[in-house]
């Protein structure tokens, strides 16, 4: 993470659209399973931040673009940093679910 990451404003709505148009990308929610079931962005996968070390078992392609979000942005920042340390090369912290304006899905998927 660079100093610019701290001050850069990210529009989760634009980033979700970018994810959906980027070939092979993964939209990753690092919220708790309960938060995810209550509402999530369609097409996202859920790996709670405390289980992010297990990502290597679920996200096999370390070169695939990964767009990470959480509730407010802080867990996404932590997870994105950890994913980079695990060898994932194209990881984007797209911020917090609170700012998302699109339609939500409920339940596990």
Predicted regions and their residues:
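Rhodanese-like catalytic fold shared by cysteine-dependent sulfurtransferases
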Residues: 2-18, 22-25, 33-64, 74-109
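N-terminal glycine-rich beta->alpha transition that marks the start or flank
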Residues: 29
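Short, surface-exposed ligand- or partner-binding patches at beta-edge/loop junctions that are enriched
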Residues: 69
